[in-house]
Design a protein with these regions (language model features):
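Bacterial N-terminal signal peptides that target proteins for export
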Residues: 3-16
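Sequence/structural segment immediately N-terminal to covalent heme-attachment motifs in c-type
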Residues: 28-45
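Axial heme c-ligation environment in periplasmic c-type cytochrome domains
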Residues: 41, 50-61, 76-103
């Protein structure tokens, strides 16, 4: 039986799928991490709950070179006065490494 080479567009489809998995994987993992750490009990991507919406947080820190460090500190140490009267309690159970992943996810649009 004669075998025919795969059509050239197949390579593009495969590369596209690999790229999708490569970029979506970390985002999904970081959303799951935020959920596991309890962040989504008070925050949502696009809606203010107890705390600000993540899109509003990302917008506030757009262009700020220290944004990630500020968010990591807020996650781990809590904070007050940035988003109204409700204070964010410290989340000491969140490791520095996990706080960095969550901060990056928030700044990237929390998708």
């Amino acid at each position: 039986m004669k075998q025919h080479p795969a059509p050239p567009y197949r390579a593009g489809q495969v590369l596209g799928l690999v790229a999708l998995i490569a970029f979506a994987g970390p985002a999904l993992a970081n959303k799951a991490l935020a959920e596991k750490q309890g962040c989504l009990a008070c925050h949502a991507a696009a809606t203010k709950l107890v705390g600000p919406a993540y899109r509003d947080v990302a917008a506030k820190y757009t262009g700020d070179a220290n944004a990630s460090a500020i968010l990591v500190q807020s996650i781990r140490n809590g904070g007050a006065g940035k988003w109204g009267e409700m204070a964010m309690p410290p989340q000491k159970q969140v490791s520095e490494a996990d706080a960095k992943k969550i901060a990056r996810w928030i700044l990237d649009g929390a998708k």
